[in-house]
Amino acid sequence: MATSSQPVAQPATKSIVGQLSLLDRFLPLWIFLAMAIGVGLGAIAPGIKGVFNTLSIGTVSLPIAIGLLWMMYPVLAKVRYEELGKIGDAKRQFSVSLFLNWLIGPAVMFALAWIFLANEPGFRTGLIITGLARCIAMVLIWNMLAGGDSEYCAVLVALNSVFQIILYSPLAYFYLMVVPSWLGLEGTTVDITMWDIAKSVLIFLGIPLAAGIITRFYFLRRKGREWYETELMPRLGPTAMIGLLFTIVVMFSMQGDRILAQPLDVLKVAVPLLFYFVLMFFLSFGLAFVSKFGYKMSATQSFTAASNNFELAIAVAVATFGIVSDEAFATVIGPLIEVPVLIGLVYVSLWLSRVAFGRREAMPEVA
C-alpha cells in the first residue's frame, strides 16, 4: 500500500473533465433528462402509476425493485474486496477515515438538514439517509483525478461496503428517531422502525453486495484480474446508469404534477448538500494535514469523506418511504450536486497540493 512517504503522483496534463467518461462527465445532464422524461411521461400517461404498481415486492413495485437492484450490482462488483487484508498496513489512517465517515459525516448532514430544512421533514429525512450512505463508487474517480492513494482508496471502499450492511440501519434509526428526541426536536413524521430500514438495506444492498462479491471472486478465479478489469467491468459497470436513470424516470413520472407546481424544491435540497460536500472536504483535508498523512493520503481521506453512495440512499428511501415521497425526491438531488461540486474540489485538492505540500507541477487545464 502507498504511504505518505512515497512521491506524489504527477498531475494529469489532460483536463480533469476530459479524463471522465462520457457517462460520468454528463451525469447531471442525464439525470435532468431522466427527470424531464419522467415528468413528461406522467403528464402524457397519467395511468402509468397503476402499471408500475401492478406487481410489487413489499411496498416497492417490481420494475422499480429491478432498477434499484441493478444500479447497485455493477458498482459492488467493482469493489476490490480482496484488498481488505491490507487494513493492517495503515491502521492509523483507516481509524481516521472510519471516524470521518461514520461519526462526523452523518452528524454534519444531520445538522445541515435541520438547519436548512427544519420545516420540511421529508426532505430533511432524505438528506439524513443520504449522509449515512458512504461513497463506494465515484470516490475512486475523484481520488484518481486528484492523484490520491489508489490502493488505500480501494481498501477503504471495500471496508465501507461491509460497514454499510452493519451500521446503516442502526445509524439511520438513531439520527431519524433517537437524536431528535434527545434534542427536543420534532421527529420524522413517518412512523418507522429499525427493521423497516434494515429490511430495505438487506434487500437493496445485501442482495447486490452478495451478487457483486460472488461475481468478482468467481471471474477473478476463472478468467483472471486482467480480463475482469479490462473486459467485464468496462461492459458491466456502465449498465448501473441504466438502473439509476430508469428509477428516476419512474419516480418523476409518478410525481410530475407536484414537481411542476413546486420547482424550487430542488433548490431547497441542493443548498445543504452543497454545504455538506464542501465542509466535509475541508474538514477531512485539514485533519489529514495536521495528522501528517501526506498529500496522497490526505486527498483520499477528503474525497472519501465528502462523497456519498447516492444509489443506496435512493434505494433505501424508495423502499422505506415510497417512490413518490419527499424522502426519495431528496435523495435524487444528491448526484445532481455531487458531480459538479466534486469536480471543482478536485481542482481545489490539486491547488492544495501545491500550497500545502510544495508540489511545483503545472495544474491540469480547466477544459
What are the functions of these language-model segments?
Residues 1-78, 82-306, 310-367:
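Alpha-helical transmembrane segments of multi-pass small-molecule/ion transporters
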